[in-house]
A protein has these predicted regions:
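Extracellular glycan-recognition regions
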Residues: 1-139
Length: 139
């Protein structure tokens, strides 16, 4: 899925992908604007109410990003790409309650006194692109 967040302008403006089971069990991958110099490419994983946040700084001039979200039973992978072709891993995680039915999709938020336009395009449901490894069910 492609995100265009050209119009973000306020600290903490963010958009990306999310998987939601309930308020105690969810994950997200996104870009969060910080300032004119950098922003955070990151993920949050919440299991049984406990969250962690993993980030890396990327230049603030990155305004378009693609995401790929994959699942193998109760393990999940979030990847990103500047062009929708060459994806790199952002996060692999285990969701303790994530083996059953899930809800997933897009999200955008501007948690401070602000708003911005995020554009989401090219969302596709495909076969799992995350290749199996030893001990996992094959494709």
């Amino acid at each position: 899925m492609k995100t265009d967040f050209t119009e973000r302008h306020h600290r903490f403006d963010q958009c990306g992908i999310a998987m939601y089971l309930d308020s105690e069990n969810w994950l997200k991958g996104s870009v969060e604007y910080e300032n004119e110099t950098f922003q955070h490419l990151g993920s949050v994983v919440t299991n049984h109410g406990y969250s962690d946040w993993a980030t890396t700084a990327i230049p603030a001039d990155v305004k378009v990003l693609w995401y790929r979200f994959s699942r193998r039973e109760d393990d999940y992978c979030i990847e990103c790409s500047p062009d929708g072709e060459a994806f790199t891993q952002m996060r692999v995680c285990h969701m303790w309650e994530g083996a059953g039915r899930i809800r997933f999709g897009i999200y955008a938020c501007s948690p401070e006194d602000s708003s911005f336009k995020a554009v989401f395009t090219d969302m596709k449901l495909t076969d799992c692109a995350w290749k199996a490894h030893d001990g996992q069910q094959p494709d």
